[in-house]
Amino acid sequence: MTRSGSRGEELPVTLFRIDISGDVSEYSGDISNPTGIAFSPDGQMFVSSRLEGVVYRLNPFKEAVAFARNLGVATGIAFDPQGVMYVGDRTGTIFRINGIGEERTWTQIEPSVSAFHLAFGPDDSLYVSAPTVTSFDVIWRINRDGDTDIFFKGLGRPQGLAFDRDGNLYVAAALRGRRGIVRISADGSDAKLIAAGVNLVGLAFSAAGEMAVVSIDSVYSLPVQIKGTLLPE
C-alpha cells in the first residue's frame, strides 16, 4: 500500500505491507509520492512516483531501483497477459514499457485531475479510470492496438479498478449520487452500487474472496466471497 502525501512531501515511510491477518508493517521509504503498485508475472514489485515520473523496481532488500523514466505524472501501472508493462501519465498518455525499461507512447486519452487507474480485463483490453470534476466520468477500454472506446459512462470520480473471475468490473466511484464500490457487468450494460463508503480510492480481492477497500486513511476488509484476478496465469 502507498502513502503518497502531497506533491513533494517527504515522508519517512511511503510503502506499507498488510498481511492476511490485517497486521501492518513498514516496507520502504525510498520513493517520493508513490502512487501505483503492480507485480510482474514473475513476482517483482513495481511502484510509480508521480513526482519524478519514474517507475521503480523493488529488489529483495526492499531497495528502490529506477526501471523506467520520463513518464510524466506517472500513476497507474498494469501488466498485460504477456507481461508487458503499461503506465498511465495523468496528463493524458498511456506508455508501453519494454523489458529493459524503454518507454514509448502507446495511446492518448483525456487527462485526469487525480490519477489514471489501470487494469487488464478478461478480453485482454486495458481498462482505465481517469477522474475529472464531472459526475459523468467514463471507464476507457483500450484494445491491443491502442484504439480507445468508452466501456461505461456515468460515474463520479472513478478511481481504483479490479475484475472478478466472471469479468465483472469493480470501481471505487459514485453512481447516481451515491459513493462506494460499483459493480459493472462484463458487457458494460449495467452498474450497481454494492458497498457504500466515502473517500474510497482503491480496492483489491484476496485469495480468500475478501475485498480490501482503501480510503484516504484506512483499509477495510469485506467478506464478499468474490474471486478476483491479479496476475496472468
Question: What kind of feature is each model-predicted range?
Answer:
Residues 1-233:
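Sequence-structural signature of mature extracellular/luminal beta-sheet repeat domains
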